[in-house]
Amino acid sequence: MTRQCPPQESGAALSGSVLAEAAVVFAVVLSIHAAVWDRYSWCAVALAVQAFYVQYKWDRLLQQGNAVFQFRMSANSGLLPASMVMPLLGLVMKERCQTAGNPYFERFGIVVAATGMAVALFSSVLALGITRPVPTNTCAISGLAGGVIIYIMRHSLSVGEVIEVLEVLLIFVYLNMILLYLLPRCFTPGEALLVLGGISFVLNQLIKRSLTESQGDPVDFFLLVVVVGMVLMGVFFSTLFVFMDSGTWASSIFFHLMTCVLGLGVVLPWLHWLIRRNPLLWLLQFLFYTETRIYLLAYWSLLASVACLVVLYQNAKRSSSESKKHRAPTITRKYFHFIVVATYIPGIIFDRPLLYVAATVCLAVFIFLEYVRYFRIKPLGHTLRSLLSLFLDERDSGPLILTHIYLLLGMSLPIWLIPRPCTQKDSLEGARALVPYAGVLAVGVGDTVASIFGSTMGEIRWPGTKKTFEGTMTSIFAQIISVALILIFDSGVDLNYSYAWILGSISTVSLLEAYTTQIDNLLLPLYLLILLMA
């Protein structure tokens, strides 16, 4: 996040910040490797080494403008931190499920790790293939690491699991070609790897479960169908509006009609097929099942109203000011972080399944409103463009505004990714008890405090970056205080004397926040989740 110290622009400074970011990522990789210590963790180490070398090739391609697609230019490629998320997440999921004696989800964790390695290797091969002259040494390192990974995975995965990994890789390749063409400057290569890799895996899981008629928790199917449905809707309308003007009333009416058709004719029947009941009735019964849920929904509605009032108030201030290019200051943008923290903490403490579903619904609403804004759909399209432009920052350089969606994802992914079948009564012991709070700690508290204190009182900059030492230290301190408050108010959290690991995890992720130029709302919670679950 921004801290208002002038950044250094020299190539040496940039290289230093990239090296520091890489050092933090390697510290995480080696920590997980030491905790797991099997052939899969050795694969993760090999992947990190090759991603470190290939990352510089991506950076050079971006600087020279020779990348295949138009990527976000205000950051480095971010290949190394993004490449390690899915593999490390799969490794820690495998360990937890192996300890819990759940062989099915243990294998699922291995598939997640293998899939993450496959898409990361593809991104590396893409960079090496378009680099001129061909980087012989980097190709040798990448080929050696890739050969080791493929050899180990070939002798570890079943034929069905190999096919599943290849299916995800195929979907990932097609999504890259489609979405990176339709959405220029919205992603760095690392962000594209992380976001599109996750979407590809979700899409493949939904197809697999639909074809096999597998049984599962309806809330999991609800998340899968909503994510895939919204992505397919975006691809459909992006393709359609290439041939017609989306800003007319006729196009807007057609947009709303087709949204209803896709929702009622595709998404709802698909969900009905998976959960074997009426989706709308199930959702209503689920939301109003207990009095606690009714109170939480009322409380969240109040917070949503407050967020809307903040947006309207800030835009009213802009209208009355002399400069129409006025942008909200850092502290104003952090209001939404405070609101999100106030939203998630009661949900985590009192009713996590409700929070799981509510976050899914909120994600669908956010994406739909972004479609309305992006396509200028009447009657709200132009209004949303005006209201949200106030809160843009340097990361919103493409046609889409994704910061608020990344914030929601960063807070929700720790809730969605908990391996519930591998936990005892949906609870974890030790540092793992804080896994649901990973988004709250890393983004809601840590990133917010770091940004506010760094921009107002920060003087000592970390080398090669505009982030400040004071901001990072206050971030760590605020997260420690938050952990203490969680212990007081959440009786289900038992840290079991794992305080040193928690402090190390928080400090490591705070250092990553100081050096990364990627979307920290998404990256930081995932790394904290991985460390806490290890």
Curated annotation (Swiss-Prot):
<keyword id="KW-1133">Transmembrane helix</keyword>
<keyword id="KW-0812">Transmembrane</keyword>
<feature type="topological domain" description="Cytoplasmic">
    <location>
        <begin position="154"/>
        <end position="161"/>
    </location>
</feature>
<feature type="topological domain" description="Extracellular">
    <location>
        <begin position="315"/>
        <end position="333"/>
    </location>
</feature>
<dbReference type="GO" id="GO:0004168">
    <property type="term" value="F:dolichol kinase activity"/>
</dbReference>
<feature type="topological domain" description="Extracellular">
    <location>
        <begin position="38"/>
        <end position="72"/>
    </location>
</feature>
<feature type="transmembrane region" description="Helical; Name=12">
    <location>
        <begin position="398"/>
        <end position="418"/>
    </location>
</feature>
<feature type="transmembrane region" description="Helical; Name=13">
    <location>
        <begin position="433"/>
        <end position="453"/>
    </location>
</feature>
<dbReference type="GO" id="GO:0006487">
    <property type="term" value="P:protein N-linked glycosylation"/>
</dbReference>
<feature type="transmembrane region" description="Helical; Name=4">
    <location>
        <begin position="133"/>
        <end position="153"/>
    </location>
</feature>
<feature type="transmembrane region" description="Helical; Name=7">
    <location>
        <begin position="221"/>
        <end position="241"/>
    </location>
</feature>
<keyword id="KW-0472">Membrane</keyword>
<feature type="topological domain" description="Cytoplasmic">
    <location>
        <begin position="208"/>
        <end position="220"/>
    </location>
</feature>
<keyword id="KW-0256">Endoplasmic reticulum</keyword>
<dbReference type="GO" id="GO:0180047">
    <property type="term" value="P:dolichol phosphate mannose biosynthetic process"/>
</dbReference>
<feature type="topological domain" description="Cytoplasmic">
    <location>
        <begin position="274"/>
        <end position="293"/>
    </location>
</feature>
<feature type="region of interest" description="CTP-binding">
    <location>
        <begin position="455"/>
        <end position="470"/>
    </location>
</feature>
<feature type="transmembrane region" description="Helical; Name=10">
    <location>
        <begin position="334"/>
        <end position="350"/>
    </location>
</feature>
<keyword id="KW-0443">Lipid metabolism</keyword>
<dbReference type="GO" id="GO:0005789">
    <property type="term" value="C:endoplasmic reticulum membrane"/>
</dbReference>
<dbReference type="GO" id="GO:0019348">
    <property type="term" value="P:dolichol metabolic process"/>
</dbReference>
<dbReference type="GO" id="GO:0035268">
    <property type="term" value="P:protein mannosylation"/>
</dbReference>
<feature type="transmembrane region" description="Helical; Name=8">
    <location>
        <begin position="253"/>
        <end position="273"/>
    </location>
</feature>
<feature type="topological domain" description="Extracellular">
    <location>
        <begin position="242"/>
        <end position="252"/>
    </location>
</feature>
<dbReference type="GO" id="GO:0043048">
    <property type="term" value="P:dolichyl monophosphate biosynthetic process"/>
</dbReference>
<feature type="topological domain" description="Extracellular">
    <location>
        <begin position="183"/>
        <end position="186"/>
    </location>
</feature>
<feature type="transmembrane region" description="Helical; Name=11">
    <location>
        <begin position="356"/>
        <end position="376"/>
    </location>
</feature>
<feature type="topological domain" description="Cytoplasmic">
    <location>
        <begin position="1"/>
        <end position="16"/>
    </location>
</feature>
<protein>
    <recommendedName>
        <fullName>Dolichol kinase</fullName>
        <ecNumber>2.7.1.108</ecNumber>
    </recommendedName>
</protein>
<feature type="transmembrane region" description="Helical; Name=2">
    <location>
        <begin position="73"/>
        <end position="93"/>
    </location>
</feature>
<dbReference type="InterPro" id="IPR032974">
    <property type="entry name" value="Polypren_kinase"/>
</dbReference>
<feature type="topological domain" description="Cytoplasmic">
    <location>
        <begin position="490"/>
        <end position="491"/>
    </location>
</feature>
<feature type="transmembrane region" description="Helical; Name=15">
    <location>
        <begin position="492"/>
        <end position="512"/>
    </location>
</feature>
<feature type="topological domain" description="Extracellular">
    <location>
        <begin position="377"/>
        <end position="397"/>
    </location>
</feature>
<feature type="transmembrane region" description="Helical; Name=14">
    <location>
        <begin position="469"/>
        <end position="489"/>
    </location>
</feature>
<feature type="topological domain" description="Cytoplasmic">
    <location>
        <begin position="94"/>
        <end position="109"/>
    </location>
</feature>
<feature type="topological domain" description="Extracellular">
    <location>
        <begin position="454"/>
        <end position="468"/>
    </location>
</feature>
<feature type="topological domain" description="Extracellular">
    <location>
        <begin position="513"/>
        <end position="534"/>
    </location>
</feature>
<comment type="pathway">
    <text>Protein modification; protein glycosylation.</text>
</comment>
<feature type="transmembrane region" description="Helical; Name=9">
    <location>
        <begin position="294"/>
        <end position="314"/>
    </location>
</feature>
<keyword id="KW-0808">Transferase</keyword>
<feature type="transmembrane region" description="Helical; Name=5">
    <location>
        <begin position="162"/>
        <end position="182"/>
    </location>
</feature>
